[in-house]
Amino acid sequence: MKYLEVTFTTHPCNETVNDVVSALAGEIGFESFVECEGGIQAYIQQTLFDEEALKEMVANFPLPDTRIEYTIKEAEDKNWNEEWEKNFFQPIVIGDRCCIHSTFHKDTPKTEYEILINPQMAFGTGHHETTSSIISELLEADLKGKSVLDMGCGTSILAILASMRGANPVTAIDIDDWCVNNSKDNIALNHIHNITVELGDANLLKGRKAFDVIIANINRNILLADLPHYAACMHPGSEIFMSGFYIQDIPFIREKAESLGMEFVHHREKNNWAAVKFIMK
């Protein structure tokens, strides 16, 4: 899976400007951000990159007296296992109940749920606020014996946790073949046998039997586009957990979900990132 690295140089360079850059870039497909000298670096899959959308974003930047410049290059291919070991990548503990770590970690904290992953890329490892927020939701949800769908599964951390918490069966779907292959590796690493991994998008859901629980940690635009597909495979009482967007995006998600017959339950916030829960009426 190839990524592009776009370096935004912001004038002035401050937290507010960088937060707005990240929010707007996230809406056009960028999925990871790193602060750098003079601005912020953003990463996007090459196949999803739309430079016209990027130019429009910069041209219509909403903050007054602000100038944005950018450069584009291919993100460096690295052996992420080696890089993370070298940089002392630490296990992630969420809610004192779930520890996510890799095979090279020793003496990890003992928690109720332990998820092993092989970090073969920079993204999808459980560090992001959206992933940890959905994990917190799953730790509180009643999943025993329930059918679960993980859309945009990435490394399948969420699908794996759902299975560990008693969900059965579990379906994990991603549009990227690398994610599908890495998901299968991680599922095997955790000795899980009831997760089916599929390559594709929300169109795969047509004609499916309804799921009891849906997880979708993607981004605002894809969620808004795909919510009708999700609604079509939910029954009264089905729950859906969504993340991948900012607090200010909740009204857009809520309006769309409620128009499809869903009832808003609650949201949680972490560093301005949001996770929401709805139930189908």
UniProtKB/Swiss-Prot annotation:
It catalyses: L-lysyl-[protein] + 3 S-adenosyl-L-methionine = N(6),N(6),N(6)-trimethyl-L-lysyl-[protein] + 3 S-adenosyl-L-homocysteine + 3 H(+). Its EC number is 2.1.1.-. S-adenosyl-L-methionine binds at residues 131, 152, 174, 217. SUPFAM superfamilies: S-adenosyl-L-methionine-dependent methyltransferases. It is found in: Cytoplasm. The keyword Magnesium does not apply. GO terms for molecular function: protein-lysine N-methyltransferase activity. Gene3D superfamilies: Vaccinia Virus protein VP39. NCBIfam families: PRK00517.2-2. Belongs to the methyltransferase superfamily. PrmA family. This is Ribosomal protein L11 methyltransferase.
